[in-house]
Amino acid sequence: MMHPRQRGAALNNNSNNDDTDAQKHADENGYPHLIVFDLDACFWNQEMYQLYDICESKDNIVDEKTNTVVGAVSGRTVIRMHEGSRKALTEYYEGKYPGARLATASSADTPLAVKIGQSALRNLEIAPGVSAASVFAIGWEKEFDGNMQIGRTPPLSANKAQTHFPILRKFTNIEYHKMLFFDDCNWGDHCAAVESQCVEPKAGLGPAIQLSLIHI
């Protein structure tokens, strides 16, 4: 797990006002306040538990036309974002979803799998010098990582509805029904569990769910 160093806040010192402004912009434009991505075989093409080596920048695969890192290498395996993921992050980086923020909810199996995933996020890019990790950090205070819930080591678990999402709710201060969750798990229904178990008391609603869109 990436432990949150600070509670959910915006980039400058006037965090409460910025949080309110961000939420207002999201509401005005009909966007969720928090867009949450599963990672393995959803955001990108690989399962981190099957890999054994941390991704190093010296091994990156760079697209010669765009000078952008399109592949992070773990051993002999290349980790690539799905085109839908790349498009979503690019549009977000370009400011097409004002007020929304990004997060991850990934139940990577082992501490090593978590580290490999984190290294892939640091190396993969949507534009020259713009890493996926840096896009996930947009809108949050420097050093805040409470939006990046990766792994299943306590307090996380394999059950995202019981751990990942309650932790995201706590550290981002964003209500469940104002979240959108992308997950295409084919061995269990994380989406249904999150939608039914993570319900905001006053609204009576859980996160909106989207299956498999990341592959488009």
Residue ranges and their predicted role:
Residues H3-A9, D19-D145:
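Alpha-helical substrate-recognition element adjacent to the catalytic core
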Residues D183-V199:
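Acidic, divalent-metal-coordinating active-site segment for phosphoryl/phosphodiester hydrolysis
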Residues I214-I216:
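Conserved small/polar residues in nucleotide/adenosyl-binding loops
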